[in-house]
Amino acid sequence: MEKGKGVSRKGRKLASSRRRQAREPADGQDAPVAAEAESWPSDADAELQGFFQDCGAKERGFVTREDLAEARFSFLGGEEPQMIFDWVDVESRGHLSLEEFSSGLKNVFGSSPGTHRLRTKRSLPSQRESVTSTLPVPEEADAEEKEAFLALIGQMETGHSLSEQAEIWKLWRELRQEEPQLAGNLEGFLAKMSSRLQEAQADREALAWTLRKRDSDHLYKVRQLYEETEEQIRREKQQLQAQSDSRGMALSAHMQEALEAKEQEVQRLAEGQRELEAQLLHLSSTQQEANRENLQLREAERDLAGQLEEVRGQLQVTRGHLDTARTRGKVSWQIEEEPSVPRANKEAPDPQAVPTEEAPLPELFGNNDNWDQFLSSIEAHSHRTLRLCWSPPPSPSSTSAPQTPRIVRQISISKISALQFSQEPASDPDPGPRGSPEVPPGGAKDGKGVEDPKGQDEQDVSSKQPVDSPDSDARPKGSFLWSLPGALTAESGTVEAAFRDQLAFEAEPPPQGLSSSPQSPAGSRKQTQTPDLGDKSLWSGPDPAKQSLEREVMAEDLKLGLGSQGATALPEGATEPSLSLESVDQVGPERPVQDATHLARQESHAKGFQEAPGQVLSLDSLPTHLPQSLEEQLRPEEGNLGERGQQDPGSEASESHGLEARSMESPQQDDPLPNTSQPPAETEVPAPGQMSPPRGSPILGAGAGLAVGTPETTHTLLTLAESEAQPGPVSMPVQVESKSGAPQPTEPEAESRPEDPRTDLQEAERSSSPGDLTAGKPQADPDYLYHVVFLGDSNVGKTSFLHLLHHDAFATGLTATVGVDFRVKNLLVDNKTFALQLWDTAGQERYHSLTRQLLRKAEGVVLMYDVTSQESFTHVRYWLDCLQDAGVEGVAMVLLGNKMDCEEERQVPTEAGRRLAQELGVSFGECSAALGHNILEPMMNLARSLKMQEDRLKASLAEVTHPQSTKRAGCCH
């Protein structure tokens, strides 16, 4: 047995050695194959990068297990990429970076001992044989044992390591040799355990796969929830931001509206403050002016009060002298008639017994003075300004009544400077009833109504009142016209003052020439109104004896401030002349005097002038008809004393009315200065043999009084005064047409003209040469003449606009223009006269050919549209095309929108018209022919544009010089 065992062991040993020998070359051959299998494929990198690009891992920067589930690699199986991912993802993050996955895959192929097992599947028998050949089978094992063992291993189908296979081999061989019945049990156990291991391995892999799947699904869901949460948060943020923005915008708009309201309120308050400040300034200036006027009035009141006291004192003295003279004269007559009472049947005493020229006022003239000498001195100095007008008293009606001494029955002491406002000449000696309708027959008294203590009416300081006479009751008291409204009384109206003035004038040297003082002396504030020179009775021909008298009186009157402004100075320094009676009411519209003010001024003339005879007046308002007053005042009185005494009251009243009418005409008709008429004025001069109109002729021209205050006017006035005394026919202006006498149709003024007579006089002097009688007429040729065409659709208001422009009135019911209409409008713009030929075209289409013909010579165009019609505004471009077709270039245009008063029906906004005007480069405006709004301004602007265009055209003209031929020096060069 032992020997057989030894043989078997030896044979077994030999068999193992033979297997080892047979395996060595196989091992040598397998070694390079294994090394070759474990190497990294060359195309694996390119395939791996393509996978990263396809699955989007390259863009994300990492790879997930879901990406590997769809991966297909040539060097890996279907599930091997996921297994490699699980092996590399130690932290179970669910994603790996590209570098981590690539390095892990390379490590699996390079150094891992199970790489060959992962790469290859030994399903083929050849591979199994190669594997079994590598088992550590002892050499002494025979072929049968090897085949049985390999069959056992093949049945197990489990991969075991070489050490495990060696242990199984030993265990199986020992059981086979020692206990063969147990070898089958071992084989069944190994097969069963192998199957269980396989099942466990499969379960493990399935569980791992499920776990990984769940993990990936969980991660996907978490990521999805995260993204949804982020999206919801983003939407919530956007919604909150939108709500916040809307609230902010609403709050901002509300605050902006509140701020604008506050700003408007501040602007209104500022405007109100400015208006209040302006009103305060105006009120303060008015108050200051009123204070100044009050001061002036107080000073004038004090002066008047002082003068009144002085006049009262003089009046008292005069009363005393008159009472004394009356008493003495009465006593002398009584003494003279006492012896003649018992001889009533005898003849009348000789007129020479009682001399008519005895001295009736011994206290005034002295006991040794001669009355004849006094009267002769009065005749010698009658050319002075002092006059004594007297008439013999009537004879007594009965011897029983006391007779008035034959003294001066009526004494009128006056100065020539007070004659301007009189209604009859001062040389009229008859104090008969000449009361005008405006003045009661009692004569005018002073402002305070001084009365005689005995109840008798007192004389006015300057009125012609007769001394009390026996026939004072039979004859009505004469009403002298010095006290009419607007007249002034003389300063000295008593006998004593008359003689004092007479002595003062005799002491003065005679004047050397006719010169006017620019300022009037104090105490000479008198006003004069001239009678009409048209009366034939006032003109007695040139009297050589009156020439020196008139010259001296003229100079004396100018020295005394004759023709000055009036007793009451106007508060604003107006220089308009003061006219008496109704002549003030007939002043033209250039002197707007209210009725109440006029009546108050008349009353002040009737009262206040007697209280203030000494106020100073300026010479600025000297009337231009002064020589006529002087001529009538200083006419000879020979032959009038007897006639005046025999006139009846009817003739005197008619003469008084004639004087009133003449005083109304004198400011308009008797202006001897042809170059001082207001423009426009027409003056007609009669022929040398033609007489002026009579005293009662109607007024031919109602012109306003001129304020003549310049030295040239005064010099002309004095020259005319001298020329009246020269022999020869007299040529006086008989008709003066002024603005007030012949009003022209009112049109919108291109320039505001002041209504000051001075300004009108200066304009007349500038526009006409001296002596030009037609200077006031409008110029025949304008400065500029332009051709203007109105374009626009029908019914836009072109005809209404032109009608309002010409007639200053809106005409209703105008029909559509047929063809074309033509008007001429004269405008005064920038001191230049523009004559605009305005062509009103028809808007109907059938007249457009005629309109195109007119456009060829157009220099200005007015494009008019209706703001209530969008179609008319659109057709403006059609009219522009018509202008272009007509070949008109450089035309001044105005775009004008009419009917702006129809705001509710407006279809064309103002901004649209302004934009179109800016696009065309023309001026723009909107007007309303119904309301008369903005009618004249566009035409004035068009006139200025036409003038500027003409100026530019003149400036752009180039002078064409004729080429000059150069002369050659000789015939050959």
From Swiss-Prot:
Biased composition (Polar residues): 123-135, 665-680
Positions of region (Disordered): 1-42, 112-140, 319-368, 421-481, 493-708, 724-779
Biased composition (Low complexity): 513-524
InterPro entries (UniProt xref): EF-hand-dom_pair, P-loop_NTPase, Rab, Small_GTP-bd, Small_GTPase
GO terms under cellular component: plasma membrane
A GO biological-process term: histamine secretion by mast cell
Start-end of Pro residues biased regions: 428-440
Amino acid composition bias (Basic and acidic residues), ranges on this chain: 445-457, 548-559, 598-608, 654-663, 750-766
Keywords of this entry: Cell membrane, Coiled coil, GTP-binding, Lipoprotein, Membrane, Nucleotide-binding, Prenylation
Topology of the protein relative to the lipid bilayer: Lipid-anchor
CDD domains: Rab (cd00154)
An example Gene Ontology molecular-function term: GTPase activity
Ligand binding (GTP): 792-799, 840-844, 898-901
Domain EF-hand: 77-111
UniProt feature coiled coil, ranges: 219-310
Record-linked Pfam families: Ras
Location in or out of the cell: Cell membrane
Predominant place of localization: membrane
Lipidation (S-geranylgeranyl cysteine): C971, C972
Comp. bias intervals (Basic residues): 1-21
Similarity remark: Belongs to the small GTPase superfamily. Rab family.
UniProt-recorded name of the protein: Ras-related protein Rab-44
Organism: Mus musculus (Mouse)
